[in-house]
A protein has these predicted regions:
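N-terminal accessory regions of nucleic-acid-interacting proteins
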Residues: 2, 142-206
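Alpha-helix N-cap recognition
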Residues: 8, 160-165, 235-238, 308
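Polyanion-binding interface signature
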Residues: 216-219, 227-229
């Protein structure tokens, strides 16, 4: 168990991360559990650990505790820890502050022994998600299907409705409320293993796809895919507001913007707060934008257990070049800020793949 994914492991002890965070890894046995964590360096009896987050959290203490156990088992002296967080913020912890928390740390770790496979948002970054969800479906757990929750199933039960029977008749599905109807179509798609088109939607032919990478509150990379050309705009300095070139490019191209989820458009709109003179152009650029995720939620159902861009695009045959995800980008960019400039290419590749995957999905949807 990689303790850097503690919150995921608490939801499901079988969680297997898709991305291994940078650092020197070690394993340590705590009360019969083989746990894994990492550290940046061991220097002057101090263990240095790099994590994301703006403030020191309890899971950081657990991470430090595992490192303490590992180094003391190696016969090394430990006086304390340095936890480096977002934007170079460093928290220094003396060993006695950690030891005081040992009972609560062990209590939290013991919870991992009592866990069971429980599908949820934590599944997004799990390597065995597809196989696991398939097994759960065979056992009758319908909650792995998007839009199917315990509450939705309870509602069907109170209505004396068997959803597995209803999905055999499309006309019957149309009689339900909108959120129930979408849940039933998603279920039908999974069990029939085919994509379902629920509504007619005119999709654009001439457009620019864009995707934004964010670190903390800093939107540092705006990537655009115009036809087959990838055009990135990198804003390394969070205090510089030199957005003119990017806004002029979009304004001159005068094409519909396509994105996946609302984060990207929010990032563009946020620019107007720093540069109010660009507001009218930004509003014009975004007035006819298309959220492909919204299209998918409303107009299609797919035989997958997650509607993330990665899962939908992989279903349509898209191949990603990196193991990064939205959260992993934080840790990789953190390495860049610490001086490892070589990692930036991986972020560019990931951002470009996000754009190309979005276009790939959009073009596939046009075939239905």
């Amino acid at each position: 168990m990689d303790i850097l994914y503690l919150e995921n492991l608490k939801q499901c002890p079988d969680f297997v991360e898709t991305f291994k965070r940078p650092g020197k890894y070690f394993k340590v046995n705590i009360e019969g559990m083989e746990l894994e964590a990492n550290y940046e360096k061991y220097e002057d009896n101090m263990i240095h650990i790099v994590r994301t987050g703006n403030n020191l959290r309890f899971y950081h203490w657990i991470h430090a505790y595992l490192a303490y156990k590992y180094f003391t088992e190696q016969g090394k002296k430990v006086d304390g820890f340095v936890i480096e967080l977002v934007d170079g913020k460093k928290e220094k912890i003396k060993l006695d502050r950690l030891i005081i928390r040992e009972p609560n740390i062990l209590k939290e770790l013991r919870k991992l022994k009592k866990g069971y496979r429980n599908p949820g948002s934590h599944c997004r970054f799990c390597k065995i998600k597809t196989e696991c969800h398939r097994e759960l479906l065979k056992k009758g757990d319908l909650t792995v299907i998007p839009s199917i929750s315990e509450k939705v199933l309870k509602d069907f039960e109170m209505m004396n409705v068997d959803p597995l029977e209803v999905i055999n008749n499309r006309d019957e599905i149309d009689d339900f409320r909108s959120f129930q109807r979408k849940a039933l179509f998603n279920m039908k798609s999974v069990f029939e293993d085919k994509t379902l088109k629920l509504n007619e939607r005119k999709l654009p032919d001439d457009y620019i796809v864009f995707d934004v990478e964010t670190y903390g509150n800093h939107d540092f990379l705006f990537g655009f895919l115009d036809n087959d050309e990838y055009i990135p705009f990198f804003f390394e300095d969070a205090n510089k507001n030199d957005f003119e070139e990017m806004i002029e490019y979009l304004d001159n191209r005068n094409k519909k913007l396509v994105h996946y989820d609302v984060h990207d458009t929010k990032a563009l709109r946020k620019i107007a707060k720093f540069r109010p003179e660009l507001r009218s152009k930004i509003d014009k650029i975004l007035e006819d934008s298309l959220d492909l995720f919204d299209v998918i939620l409303k107009d299609f159902s797919f035989p997958v257990t997650s509607y993330s861009l990665k899962d939908i695009s992989k279903y349509f045959g898209f191949e990603w070049r990196t193991n990064l995800n939205g959260f992993a980008v934080l840790t990789v960019y953190q390495r860049y800020l610490k001086g490892d400039k070589s990692v930036m290419q991986e972020i560019y590749d990931y951002n470009e793949d996000d754009c190309r995957a979005t276009r790939h999905v959009l073009e596939e949807l046009k075939k239905f």
